[in-house]
Amino acid sequence: MEVAFDIRNFSVYYGNKVGIRNVNLEIYRNKVTAIIGPSGCGKSTLLRSLNRLIELVDGVRIEGEVIFDGKNIYDDGVDAVELRRRIGMVFQHPNPFPKSIFDNVAYGPRVHGIKDKERLKEIVEESLKKAALWDEVKDRLSDSALGLSGGQQQRLCIARAIATNPEVILFDEPTSALDPIAAAKIEELMVELKKNYTVVVVTHNIQQAARISDYVAFFWMGELVEYGKTAKVFEKPEKELTEKYLTGRVG
């Protein structure tokens, strides 16, 4: 299997506080990898390290390497803006721009230099289709994105991430603000997206991780406790702490 990210001896510190410590992990291409663990265990810290968003936090210090496409993304000379084009992100709360549905999706391609109107139309349609939203919005692309439901807004944010033609899409608790029906649509979509993208998702929802992921990483107090194929980790975890967390006895 091809490796998307090779994370080596990777640590993140917020001042004197440990975010994550000495993480070694391979994340595979065209798979869904779930990162689970209790609040404050380092899940989102790791996720935001994969496209260098973590650097935007004041006082953060980073050690170790994240190898993506043969290079350490933290090396001097790596263009963080281009990296974030290749590694898209969808956040916990839908955050559409106060613009039209069309302009939300076209925003990234325009920033990256695509000006041709026909090409932009193609990208918008293709991205909305991949985000399973096209049929619901195709007749109102000029309407404000803020008029969409929460679930539709989240799928719009996924379309916006897709529009820059990334290789990886990171999801940070993407369904926690949604009702169960909208959440189920996002879950289906994440599984579908792995055909074309590498998907990494942080989730508090253990059942969600079991349903959608191929691989699962369990974090506890900033450390990676266990990582492996989801079926194996859930059915026969190697570590007692993993088993206790999955059965609700700690966490």
From Swiss-Prot:
GO cellular component, one term: plasma membrane
Function: Part of the ABC transporter complex PstSACB involved in phosphate import. Responsible for energy coupling to the transport system.
CDD domains attached to this UniProt entry: ABC_PstB_phosphate_transporter (cd03260)
Lineage top rank: taxon: Archaea
A Pfam family recorded for this sequence: ABC_tran
Assembly description: The complex is composed of two ATP-binding proteins (PstB), two transmembrane proteins (PstC and PstA) and a solute-binding protein (PstS).
Subcellular location: Cell membrane
Keyword list, A-Z: ATP-binding, Cell membrane, Membrane, Nucleotide-binding, Phosphate transport, Translocase, Transport
Catalytic activity: phosphate(out) + ATP + H2O = ADP + 2 phosphate(in) + H(+)
Residue sites binding ATP per the record: 37-44
Protein name: Phosphate import ATP-binding protein PstB
Gene name as annotated: pstB
Domain ABC transporter, first and last residues per copy: 5-246
Disulfide bond annotation, renumbered to this chain: none
Organism of this sequence: Archaeoglobus fulgidus (strain ATCC 49558 / DSM 4304 / JCM 9628 / NBRC 100126 / VC-16)
Lineage: Archaea, Methanobacteriati, Methanobacteriota, Archaeoglobi, Archaeoglobales
GO-annotated molecular function: ATP binding; ATP hydrolysis activity; ATPase-coupled phosphate ion transmembrane transporter activity
